[in-house]
């Protein structure tokens, strides 16, 4: 009897061990597969993951929810602070903002009116301004694709914002003697792209013989600057850069807003971003006018598609590339530039859409560091938009700058013999010229490629009522902050 009970207990133990072993065998693969599924989910949309991953929006949002009433109180308190040093970061990221210097990046693309917007900063006496310094990098690394250069652009931007211009030595043309000091060791101001129109370079103290003082508002004549202002060592320009309370850099070669997140999180930079948009049809019209000057840049933008099927679909849509049956046709020489410009614009519109959705989902601290501006609003209401821009940047208003902005939008005509030369333009012509100069097929192509971004930016399709109307409620990509900035 006792032996039977002992055998029964041993049998129960064995059965229990067998059940536990079976459960372990079932759970281990399930856990491992779950981890792999999570990785697959992260890789499901790699393009969006690259953008959203760096922001850590969910973590930032969770941090904001934990702050609750404290974050709201901080925002209310920030509204009462001096506009010179606004409180722009909530406790969600725990950043200590540097209040000694403000950095602004003007985020735009080619032919959107960014030169005019940048010139408004260039004219302000409290601003140290650089015009498209990343041009040097693109020229040195051509031919490349825009996407692979984004990290290098960000690193270059970080150095320039810190008034460290030694990075330019990596990309300066080796055969340009004017760009180097007599000892050939250091660069000079002549190494900077468009240095002849820079207000700091073309005015005292760097240029004692300049016809205008730094505080005097007015366009710099490039030939006059070259004649009166011999190049000086780049170290002297770095010293001047450190004196200014606001540093502004305008460029058109950074495609994704998400690339700037490490800089926005850097408490030592105190960075804000002004992103400029323009009706894609007007952009395309302007790009066609200056097609040869933009050909290299368009190729670099379009090369980002060579790694995907969409690039081949673009080729087929334009009647070139491999077709079923193995037949292919080379691109005709005449419309080659137009083809590259059209394809590049499609890539740009996709980047716009990513930026708009990206900023729309950003936490509150980041939205307060981002200003969305449409070119049409800037040229139609220059004074109002200038006040909005200066308030966002922490800069004082100037009557002379107000008059300058108004005069620059009241020119005699839109067309110019020098498409890359800044001059006064007719604002109405600048807004509506595409209607008369683009064919119906060209308009159709642009609207088909850019429809999602156009909808978020409140640009109506051709044939619809209105033109560049203000975004309707519920369609704005970003919420307004207390200042009305988006």
Swiss-Prot record:
3'-phosphoadenylyl sulfate binds at residues 110-116, 278-286. GO terms for biological process: chondroitin sulfate proteoglycan biosynthetic process; N-acetylglucosamine metabolic process; polysaccharide metabolic process; sulfur compound metabolic process. Widely expressed. Highly expressed in heart, spleen, liver and ovary. Expressed at lower level in brain, placenta, thyroid, spinal cord and peripheral blood leukocytes. Not expressed in adult skin. Its EC number is 2.8.2.-, 2.8.2.17. One of its GO terms (molecular function) is N-acetylglucosamine 6-O-sulfotransferase activity. Gene3D superfamilies: P-loop containing nucleotide triphosphate hydrolases. This is Carbohydrate sulfotransferase 7. It comes from Homo sapiens. The gene is CHST7.
């Amino acid at each position: 009897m006792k032996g039977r009970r002992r055998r029964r207990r041993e049998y129960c133990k064995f059965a229990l061990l067998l059940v536990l072993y079976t459960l372990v065998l079932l759970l281990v693969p399930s856990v491992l597969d779950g981890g792999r599924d999570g990785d697959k989910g992260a890789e499901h949309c790699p393009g969006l993951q690259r953008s959203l991953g760096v922001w850590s929006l969910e973590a930032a949002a969770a941090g904001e929810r934990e702050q609750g009433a404290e974050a709201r109180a901080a925002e209310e308190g920030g509204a009462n602070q001096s506009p010179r040093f606004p409180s722009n970061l909530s406790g969600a990221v725990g950043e200590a903002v540097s209040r000694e210097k403000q950095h602004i990046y003007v985020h735009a693309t080619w032919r959107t009116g960014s030169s005019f917007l940048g010139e408004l900063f260039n004219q302000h006496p409290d601003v140290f301004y650089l015009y498209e310094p990343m041009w040097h990098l693109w020229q040195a690394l051509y031919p490349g694709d825009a996407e692979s250069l984004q990290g290098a652009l960000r690193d270059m931007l970080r150095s320039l914002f810190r008034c460290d211009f030694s990075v330019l030595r990596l990309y300066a043309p080796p055969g340009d003697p004017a760009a180097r000091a007599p000892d050939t060791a250091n660069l000079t101001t002549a190494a900077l792209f468009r240095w002849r129109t820079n207000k700091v370079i073309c005015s005292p103290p760097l240029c004692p013989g300049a016809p205008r003082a730094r505080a005097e508002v007015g366009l710099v004549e490039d030939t006059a600057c070259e004649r009166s202002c011999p190049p000086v060592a780049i170290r002297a320009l770095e010293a001047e850069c450190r004196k200014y309370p606001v540093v502004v850099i305008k460029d058109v070669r950074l495609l994704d807003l998400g690339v700037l997140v490490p800089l926005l999180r850097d408490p030592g930079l105190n960075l804000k971003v002004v992103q400029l948009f323009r009706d894609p049809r007007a952009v395309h019209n302007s790009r066609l006018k200056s097609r040869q000057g933009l050909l290299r840049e368009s190729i670099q933008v379009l090369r980002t598609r060579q790694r995907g099927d969409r690039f081949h679909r673009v080729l087929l849509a334009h009647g070139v590339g491999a077709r079923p049956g193995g037949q292919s046709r080379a691109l005709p020489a005449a419309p080659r530039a137009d083809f590259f410009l059209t394809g590049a614009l499609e890539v740009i519109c996709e980047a716009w859409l990513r930026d708009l959705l990206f900023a729309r989902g950003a936490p509150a601290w980041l939205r307060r560091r981002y200003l969305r501006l449409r070119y049409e609003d800037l040229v139609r209401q220059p004074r109002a938009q200038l006040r909005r821009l200066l308030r966002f940047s922490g800069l004082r208003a100037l009557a002379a700058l107000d008059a300058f902005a108004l005069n620059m939008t009241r020119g005699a005509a839109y067309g110019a013999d020098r498409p890359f030369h800044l001059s006064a333009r007719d604002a109405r012509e600048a807004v509506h010229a595409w209607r008369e100069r683009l064919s119906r097929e060209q308009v159709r192509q642009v609207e088909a490629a850019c429809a999602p971004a156009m909808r978020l930016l409140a640009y109506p399709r051709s044939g619809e009522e209105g033109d560049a109307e203000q975004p309707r409620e519920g369609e704005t990509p970003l919420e307004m902050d207390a200042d009305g900035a988006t």
